[in-house]
């Protein structure tokens, strides 16, 4: 029913969402939020923050997107997904009011608006101590940006994605993401590009919000295998943090940066006495954090890894991780890759990154397939883009058949 109702799109803006939440009793006003935006790393940062807060004894709601297997994954309280009954009940209730708002002339709702409203109402019912809220697209005009006073704002790595909606330069995209920054609320950002930093810093100044630049952190890696072990030090003139032997289960150097960003967000809340958490709880939370589908090792005999990279920046990080693991746990292993993507993504850049990355690790075979979506890029077209004298490429349109072949 959600798909049927959201087949048409209304005008861009928050007025429709605000009206719907008003009819629902403004559930967002009764919740405490951590707001997370960015192009890549949002989901992992959300899980790192949530895991640290849980380790300190807090009940934590997490709203993220997209899901890997089912809608329920997007609505998480203390690692328990919303039940089918609760999801259907609340979403149906939300849609009844959405129809009223549409009739009032506000326009049609998007799927994300319905799901965000469902999440806010669900979290109000369940009353977690803190909700980690991940944006969908952008920040300023994102449907999660109806919240007024988060505990802290976080902006992860920024790259080129949704350029038709956010802009075709990093500065324009950064400006859209920086729209989540609120008056007087600290913002942590890990983007190292100067043009991105300048935009976020300028918006923070306008909003009297402290800007904490996570890219200033220096780290060294002690172990890079089925887990990451690292030392890090952060100093920006006013804040200082130093921790050795930090261990995380999310794999890849980019996950170290995500972990540091999350830790600085938690530290910001602690320093302002919004939460009570010590270093041992932070360490425990970082170690126990999980994020489905982010270079996730499902099995190790043989190794089966899934990764949901959906843009060039994310895929590049996955290829860098694969290259590092080729030197350790994947040494002397055959590498067979199953790959599919959407036709409305930057698939040409992604296929070039994939080809280069797989060549670098002497991959044995690539099986290209099609996601179950009308947006899927045809496997035969993908095969032509990927074909290389160094790698065997096979096209199998059905996902399950492709995986069975691998």
Language model regions located:
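Active-site-proximal loop->helix
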Residues: 66, 70-90, 164-180, 201-202, ...
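Nucleotide phosphate-binding/pyrophosphate-handling subdomain across enzymes
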Residues: 130-135, 141-154, 158-159, 172, ...
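ATP-dependent carboxylate-amine ligase catalytic core
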Residues: 14, 21-29, 55-148, 164-166, ...
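Beta-strand->loop->alpha-helix junctions that form or flank phosphate-binding loops
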Residues: 63, 190-191, 203-225, 248-253, ...
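Acidic, Mg2+-coordinating active-site environments of NTP-dependent enzymes
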Residues: 101-102, 126-134, 150-245, 259-280
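C-terminal helical cap/extension that packs against the catalytic core
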Residues: 193-203, 208, 212, 303-306, ...
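N-terminal leader/targeting and accessory segments in enzymes
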Residues: 1-40, 44-59, 69, 127, ...
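Hydrophobic alpha-helical packing residues
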Residues: 49-54, 123, 269, 386
